[in-house]
Curated annotation (Swiss-Prot):
The keyword Ribosomal protein applies. NCBIfam families: L18_bact (TIGR00060). The keyword Nucleotidyltransferase does not apply. One of its GO terms (biological process) is translation. Part of the 50S ribosomal subunit; part of the 5S rRNA/L5/L18/L25 subcomplex. Contacts the 5S and 23S rRNAs. One of its GO terms (cellular component) is cytosolic large ribosomal subunit. Keywords: Ribonucleoprotein, Ribosomal protein, RNA-binding, rRNA-binding. PANTHER family: 39S RIBOSOMAL PROTEIN L18, MITOCHONDRIAL, LARGE RIBOSOMAL SUBUNIT PROTEIN UL18M. Belongs to the universal ribosomal protein uL18 family. One of its GO terms (molecular function) is structural constituent of ribosome. This is one of the proteins that bind and probably mediate the attachment of the 5S RNA into the large ribosomal subunit, where it forms part of the central protuberance. This is Large ribosomal subunit protein uL18.
Length: 119
């Protein structure tokens, strides 16, 4: 099967990331990964190749009860915004990575915005 779900997802992720790189060269990237059980976010400096801040539902200190729901995504978004402030970051661009900007991904982005991170 040439166009399996995985292949289509990888094509979509590359298409999204390439468009974002053209427009946002030199800016920090807020990358989101969503799995069946967890959701995570990283603040990445692509120029230096360094992760400045990260947050995930796998961390015990976030106190997430249900790891894969909208409420958990909101907590991860708030945590990444707080850690970005500690790292001295105020602005980044949002890399949804091939996931639809809906539900958990949207909740994470909204919580990061409410936390003071400009996306």
């Amino acid at each position: 099967m040439a166009n399996s779900k995985r292949t289509l997802f990888l094509k979509r992720r590359l298409r999204v990331r390439n468009k974002l790189r053209k427009v946002n060269a030199g800016r920090l990237r807020l990358s989101v990964h969503r799995s069946n059980k967890n959701i995570s976010a990283q603040l990445i400096d692509d120029v230096r190749g360094v992760t400045l801040a990260a947050a995930s539902t796998m961390e015990k200190d976030l106190g997430v009860v249900g790891k894969n729901n909208v409420e958990a995504a909101k907590k991860v978004g708030a945590a990444i915004a707080e850690r970005a402030k500690k790292a001295g970051v105020e602005e980044a661009y949002f890399d949804r990575g091939g996931f639809l900007f809906h539900g958990k991904v949207k909740a994470l982005a909204d919580a990061a915005r409410e936390g003071g991170l400009k996306i």
